[in-house]
Amino acid sequence: ISEYPLYEIGKKVGSIFQDPKSQFFASITEDEIAFGCENYGVPYEELDGRVSSAIKRINGDMLRGKEIYPMSSGEKQKIAVASVNAVDPEIYVFDEPSANLDMYSVEALKNLMGGLKAEGHTIIVAEHRLYYLTDLADRFLYMENGSIKEEWTAGELLSIPEEKRRAIGIRAADLHHIEVDIPPTKEKDMTMEVKDLAFSYRKHPVFHDISFRAYAGDLIAIVGHNGIGKTTLSNILCGMQKEKEGQVIYNGTKVSKGKRKNFAYFVMQNTDCQLFGDSVEEELLLNGKGSTQEQRDDLLKLYGLFEWKERHPATLSGGQKQRLALAVSDWIDTPVLILDEPTSGLDFKNMMRISEHLKALAQKGKTILIIT
């Protein structure tokens, strides 16, 4: 492939980024799907057919004519896949494609990959979630420090001893044998109450009649299909969007949109939107004035970021950015912490690191809501 100029590689290899938004050039779905073909000079009379075929490939008729920005991450990923499919490359490269998808969408992604494979396309997937690939992938390549260390078939992957799997940081490839410990319920103080919450986007209802209570030490999962309004709900709880109807109550008092940031901190799915420092350490300094060097170093070590302290946040991997945003949330220290897909882009070791830390925060009385 090194023998080809870059513009020729783009015709042969199509990439779907971990953050699809970073590869978009248009604001409307059909325009984005057509963009690559237009740049390669595909005749206009052929272009419409390619766009329609790509939309059909992702079962995306409902996304026709829509603005891309307000879409969910799963919907944005579908548009990214369609834009690559319209160019019709020989090779597809997916970077963490399942990180932001619900189980239903992961199954749809798997079927899409299977269809492309059946047509003779080569599929390369950089992924931490493995369970949906075990009956699809021909080979699994394990990389460490920039080189391929091991190669397995699906059967060999599934037979890796649990101890070795954990040691090398690979997530479980079989979800049917994962043990879950459910701690006993204890009496707690109520931190937050949501009453009859409703929201609409440009007169289109997103959700209505949302009511629930959260208590100190609770760790609550907010689940549902992509595009159902989970992130919008979190934005409202943190004061980044305003509800159409309903109330958000913290510690027994109704709190206006502008003051909710004092009670709840939101770690976004796309952490690029909330990282502003010129280095990892400066990101902590922006949010933790008065902290000591030792405190900052200890926090960076806790999140496995100490060796990257001088790096610019933009140069970090998706998982490292997510851990940095979580470290910042420690400085802010609001009663409620909301996380949007906190384990997306993380390997097993760092996923467990985050899991243990969130459990420790809950044990100290923090209320934690996780979108997943």
What are the functions of these language-model segments?
Residues 92-95, 337-340:
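Catalytic Walker B motif of ABC-type/P-loop ATPase nucleotide-binding domains
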Residues 127-128, 372:
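H-loop/switch region of ABC-family ATPase nucleotide-binding domains
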